[in-house]
C-alpha cells in the first residue's frame, strides 16, 4: 500500500470541508477521486500534502505516518503534487523551472530535463521561454514536469485537464499512462469522469466531504443512478 488515508477531517478556518475521508492507493495504480466542484477533492489532496494539515485522522505513505509533516518534508519522501493553479515560476524559463524543482526536492533519480521533454516534446523548443509566456496547456505540462523532476513515487493531480483544449487533454492522458508505466502511482482528483475512465482503474466518489462510492471505474459507468446523483453525467 503506497498511500492510506483514514478518517481524514480537514478544512479552512472555521469551516470543515472533509468529514472523515478514508481511501487507499496501491502501488502502480491510477485511482480517481471524483466529485463535483466543492465536493472536497482539492481539500483532500492539500491535506495529504500537508498544505492544509488534517484536523484529525491519519495519512500514511509506504507504511509511515506523514500527518503533521510539512509539505517540503512530504515531497522529499516521494510525493509529487500538481495543483489546479499550476504554480510555476512565471519569471523563470522552462528549463530553470524544471531544474529548480530538482534542486528543491533533495531527490534525484529517473527524471531529468531530457526525459521530461521526451514526455512533452512541445517543451523542447520552449526551454528558454519564461513560464509567463506559455499557454495554459504548456503551463500544465511544465507543472507536471516539475513534479516529475522531484522523482516521485506517488503523484497527486488536482484537476489536470480543467480548461484545456481536447487535443491537449488527449496528450495529457497519454502522458499519464506513460508515467504510470514508468512506475509512478497516481491519485487523480477530477470531475471529468470520461477522462478518468481512460486512465484510472479504481474510483472514489466524494460528495459534501464524504466518500459516497468506492469501486472500479467500470462499476461507476455501469451505475447510471450513481452518475446522475453525484457526477451529473
Which role does the model predict for each range below?
Residues 34-36:
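The feature captures the beta-strand-to-loop junction immediately N-terminal to the Walker
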Residues 49:
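Helix-to-loop junction immediately C-terminal to a conserved catalytic motif
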Residues 57-66, 77, 109-112, 118:
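Conserved ABC transporter NBD signature motif
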Residues 130-134, 138:
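Conserved ABC ATPase signature
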Residues 147-148:
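ABC ATPase C-loop
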Residues 155-159:
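Catalytic Walker B motif of ABC-type/P-loop ATPase nucleotide-binding domains
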Amino acid at each position: 500500500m503506497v498511500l492510506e488515508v483514514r478518517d481524514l477531517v480537514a478544512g479552512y478556518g472555521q469551516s470543515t470541508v472533509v468529514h472523515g475521508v478514508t481511501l487507499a492507493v496501491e502501488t502502480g495504480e491510477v485511482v480517481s477521486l471524483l466529485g463535483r466542484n466543492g465536493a472536497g477533492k482539492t481539500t483532500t489532496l492539500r491535506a495529504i500534502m500537508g498544505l492544509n494539515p488534517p484536523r484529525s485522522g491519519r495519512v500514511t505513505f509506504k507504511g509511515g505516518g506523514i500527518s503533521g509533516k510539512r509539505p517540503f518534508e512530504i515531497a522529499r519522501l516521494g510525493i509529487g503534487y500538481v495543483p489546479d493553479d499550476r504554480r510555476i515560476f512565471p519569471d523563470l524559463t522552462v528549463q530553470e523551472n524544471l531544474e529548480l524543482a530538482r534542486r528543491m526536492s533533495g531527490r534525484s533519480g529517473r527524471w531529468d530535463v531530457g526525459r521530461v521533454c521526451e514526455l512533452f516534446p512541445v517543451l523542447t523548443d520552449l526551454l528558454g521561454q519564461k513560464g509567463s509566456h506559455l499557454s495554459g496547456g504548456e503551463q500544465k505540462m511544465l507543472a507536471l514536469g516539475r513534479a516529475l523532476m522531484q522523482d516521485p513515487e506517488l503523484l497527486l493531480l488536482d484537476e489536470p485537464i480543467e480548461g484545456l483544449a481536447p487535443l491537449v487533454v488527449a496528450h495529457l492522458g497519454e502522458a499519464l499512462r506513460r508515467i504510470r508505466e514508468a512506475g509512478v502511482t497516481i491519485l487523480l482528483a477530477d470531475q471529468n469522469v470520461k477522462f478518468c475512465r481512460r486512465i484510472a482503474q479504481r474510483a472514489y466518489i466524494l460528495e459534501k466531504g464524504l466518500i459516497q462510492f468506492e469501486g472500479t471505474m467500470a462499476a461507476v459507468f455501469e451505475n447510471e443512478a450513481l452518475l446522475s446523483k453525484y457526477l451529473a453525467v
